[in-house]
Amino acid sequence: MSTQAVCEKCGGTGWIIVERASVSGAERCVCLTEGRAERLEERSQIPPLYRNASFENFKTEGVQELKSVMSAVKNYADTFPVGPNPGLLLIGGPGTGKTHLAVAALRRIMEKGHEGVFTDYQTLLDRIRAGYDSSSNSSNKEAYRMVLDSEVLLLDDLGAHRVTDWVQDTVTSIVTHRCNNRKPLIATTNLPDAEAGSRTTQKTALGVDYLHTLRENIGDRARSRLFEMCTVIRIDYNEDYRIRRGKRF
């Protein structure tokens, strides 16, 4: 049976007695903060694929646009939580490195001692729906409370779910709650947004129209609140970041 070493400074109490100007007082021992970033990362639910994502290992390959995007995301993380907006929204096509940069920002923020949670949009909604109780008209409270209450939430692939009224109502309630309470939200999306400068297209397959804008997939209210609280960064780069990164191995 292993035993955990007791701090020699505080004897395991977490507090030490200090004297300043002949006045005694207590302050937190450094043992409470040592390793805090590591503990926060263990609880963050970041997928193994992105667990080591950082600004240092993001491959820009000399592309100025990617350098500018990384610089903007890094600035958000470095100035957190005193930046102009509590949230960050990364818009770009699949494979543009959005998730890597979002996780890099979250990890940098956690290094400062803030708690963060990663969740995939579709998985989150599926978890909430799976726990839905029609008799009480309530959903999976654990998953729902997590995204409402977490200090910093990273929501990956925002809008990547079949559109229904329930989906739009759920994402609206989450975004609105976090916006009203100034709880930081980092989000990524493949969906274009005309007002963010994206080209928007409508695709049709087998006679069915598929909606391809952020507004149509999450609704007007959620989109409005999202843009209100977030610094919006659009990534226009055609080469797949995953393929480009793979060439390095």
How should each PLM-predicted stretch be described?
Residues 1-68, 237, 243-249:
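A short, basic N-terminal segment
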Residues 59-88:
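Pre-Walker A (pre-P-loop) alpha-helix and adjacent loop at the N terminus of AAA/AAA+ ATPase modules
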Residues 65-70, 110-149, 162-165:
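Short glycine-rich substrate-engagement loop in P-loop NTPases that contacts/grips substrate
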Residues 84-102:
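Walker A/P-loop nucleotide-binding motif
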Residues 100-114:
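P-loop NTPase Walker A phosphate-binding motif
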Residues 114-115, 149-152, 181-187:
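Loop/turn-to-beta-strand initiation segments
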